[in-house]
Amino acid sequence: MEPVTKWSPKQVVDWTRGLDDCLQPYVHKFEREKIDGEQLLKISHQDLEELGVTRIGHQELVLEAVDLLCALNYGLETDNMKNLVLKLRASSHNLQNYISSRRKSPAYDGNTSRKPPNEFLTSVVELIGAAKALLAWLDRAPFTGITDLSVTKNKIIQLCLDLTTAVQKDCLVAEMEDKVLNVVKVLNGICDKMMHSTTDPVMSQCACLEEVHLPNVRPGEGLGMYIKSTYDGLHVITGTTENSPADRSQKIHAGDEVIQVNRQTVVGWQLKNLVKKLRENPTGVVLLLKKRPTGSFSFTPAPLKNLRWKPPLVQTSPPPTTTQSPESTMDASLKKEKPAILDLYIPPPPAVPYSPRDENVSFSYRGHTKSKQPLPGRKGSESPNSFLDQESQRRRFTITDSDQLPGYSVGTNILPIKMRGKTPSYGKPRPLSMPADGNWMGIVDPFAKPRGHGRKGEDALCRYFSNERITPIIEESASPVYRFSRPLTERHLVRGADYIRGSRCYINSDLHSSATIPFQEEGPKKKSASSSAKASSGEPSLLVSWLTRLKLLTH
């Protein structure tokens, strides 16, 4: 590879054409000034201002790409794992010494000032830069396969985050320096541990460049490489596809960095411009790769399986049933290749409990209708959760009762039931003379004889029953002779028919307002009950109504 310092102005212009899209308007300015490779590596913010690159963000993009070229040109033969650890150790030690010497100065104002000096911030930036260079090595193969180095990498990342957070926090400079010192001490310990505990020769080996030719690429086949680009413009190969040109070459491995494509340096380029350069020559590609040292690790290519799904083979005849031992079954399963269907990602089931979708589903149960829209049939394209929606609608009609309820039926054209209008006294507060509890009635004995109704009793009832022309509550059974003994806990429940609500119920005589439990009736029974209600809903005398209520309460 030709050194960057030997580049001609044309090579510099060709390199700038692959940078970020926002930098393309400045390409002709580089061409007009005829900047060569040596001038490019020494370019600064002031030089970019003179070129017309006035925006700070655009200047930073150019300088980041130039930094990658400097690392490639000057650090290729010197950078290794050991040197990078030593650089990080030196940067952290320098920052620690700067803080200590500054605190010894008589002019130290860290306890009153909130603005750190520029030298302090510069040392922090240098420390983070050294850490990034080391992390770039730890994040590649073969170091990613070592557990200890992976843990160390995560610790360094966390310490760098703590360092940047401490510097950007609005606090006294002394507090900021205390936090930075804590981070620096931990970094020094990590560097010392890496230097003394690691004896593998891979720590001292440098990276190398290797040229790879991929000829005879068939149209539409592709190269079979998976490339990941970092935020600053490094392009790293993460794997290859089986039986692809990249895989057949046996020279492209996971962790290799793409430096040139067809003799054009692509460091710092956008990924889309790199892909365009790879497709420039359809017959073949020449790659220049930067390879990390392998050392004593078993470093082999990392092929990736084709992600296209292949359907499993259909069995025409059932396999013969033979008894096999667990050992033979395990060996056979290891020898067989895993079917492609097992590679598919199956999403997990919905969270429990399942919440049904709001759909207008009509169910008819013994004459009661919830909605008018019919239930849609199960289709092949629906998800399995659609059946759960139907089941959740069915569970709403489960009634806890001694009677066995038959199955439901789906209704399509069912007339809605006309609901009874509200009485004028609906929502009014109870009379002031009505006590809050039912203790005024005393304990009702179901085996006691009915009391006679005199004028005094009628006056007592007049205080508690309003004269609102409400249909009376008629007993279900007219013969009070046959009485069945109930448990003590059920003695205060009297079974009757509440025609105000339109259904049979259990009435608690100890309460001033009856709490009802809906009890669904048969169709014919309900029709007969409604007809009898119409017959008895004439206008009975007030005395009959009182007597009926009193007779019900005495049970």
From Swiss-Prot:
Residues 80-174 form the CRIC domain. Transmembrane segments: none annotated. Keywords: Cell membrane, Cytoplasm, Membrane, Phosphoprotein. Belongs to the CNKSR family. The gene is Cnksr3. The keyword Disulfide bond does not apply. It comes from Rattus norvegicus (Rat). Its main location: cytoplasm. GO terms for cellular component: apical plasma membrane; cytoplasm. GO terms for biological process: negative regulation of ERK1 and ERK2 cascade; negative regulation of peptidyl-serine phosphorylation; positive regulation of sodium ion transport; synapse organization. This is Connector enhancer of kinase suppressor of ras 3. The modification Phosphoserine is found at S381, S383. It is a peripheral membrane protein.
